[in-house]
Regions:
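GST-like domain detector, emphasizing the conserved glutathione-binding G-site
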Residues: 1-219, 223
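Proline-centered helix-kink/hinge sites
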Residues: 125-127, 237, 254-256
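Acidic, serine/threonine/proline-rich low-complexity intrinsically disordered regions
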Residues: 200, 247-253
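GST superfamily/GST-like fold recognition
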Residues: 223-249
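Single conserved hydrophobic/aromatic residue that forms the stacking wall/gate
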Residues: 251-261
Length: 261
């Protein structure tokens, strides 16, 4: 997948690997909040829009929150084509349930980034939380988008269900870190490693963390406390894709293979 460099789409793979061959995810660029205290992004119905892909686990978690928080009539959504090719995510509509770009009629997701910021340097990822009023990206970090959805629109939806309750936040943050580093991102660390040592280290951490999850859930339904929280929702999209996608494409086997030539 390419990326935007000073507003220009650059094709070809851009390495995210460290000197030791391990994979490091690039931080998201747009990190704004929606809040009554925000100078720009206030909570409003039908002002905000999601760009997502059904193929993307990071986007999947935002769709779960959109549903749970009763935001489906307040935040609109477009579904991109699940194949990511030379021009990145596209708005082709030749796949079931893809919508095209209903706002601007663009062909590619990177063009949405260019609308928001002409000279942006960024990966053109989904999910994107978009502001239709200012024609800008509010946020493209899924972990922050779900936090926004959890609380910013409560007074509009009258849905006060809290998936990041204050009394459980320390525990949620602790397990979120393990889930992100070793499972959510761990599957990519496995598949995108460039040395055998980095690959085996990623696989070891992945499966030890999955064993930890198994132990936690052996006698209870949820990861933290006795209620559904953000931690569960962050884990689910990865687990759903594990056997059918990651095992095949990213070599997530409990017995590491000789995959680095």
């Amino acid at each position: 997948m390419g990326q935007l460099v000073n507003g220009v789409w650059t094709k070809g793979s851009v390495s995210n690997n460290q000197k030791d061959g391990s994979f490091k995810r690039v931080d998201s660029v747009f990190r704004n909040e929606i809040s009554i205290n925000s100078q720009i992004y206030k909570p409003e119905t039908n002002r905000y829009h999601l760009y997502v892909s059904y193929a993307c686990p990071w986007a999947h978690r935002t769709l779960i929150f959109r549903y749970l928080k009763k935001l489906e009539n307040h935040i609109s959504v477009d579904y991109v084509h699940p194949d990511m090719l030379d021009n990145g995510w596209s708005f082709l509509k030749n796949f079931p349930k893809t919508t095209g770009d209903s706002l601007y009629g663009k062909k590619y997701v990177h063009e949405i980034y260019q609308i928001s910021e002409k000279n942006v340097s960024s990966k053109a990822t989904v999910p994107i939380l978009w502001d239709k009023k200012t024609n800008t990206i509010v946020n493209n970090e899924s972990a922050e988008i779900i936090r926004i959805m959890n609380s910013a629109f409560n007074d509009i939806t009258k849905n006060y269900d809290d998936y990041y309750p204050s009394n459980l936040r320390i525990e949620i943050d602790k397990i979120n870190k393990v889930i992100y580093e070793n499972i959510n991102n761990g599957v990519y660390k496995s598949g995108f490693s460039r040395t055998q040592e980095a690959y085996e280290d990623a696989v070891k951490k992945l499966f030890s963390s999955l064993e930890m999850i198994d132990e936690i859930l052996e006698n209870k339904e949820y990861l933290v406390g006795n209620v559904l929280t953000e931690a569960d929702i962050r884990l689910i999209p990865t687990l759903l894709r594990f056997d059918s996608v990651y095992y095949c494409l990213l070599y997530t086997s409990p017995s590491p293979r000789d995959v680095i030539q």
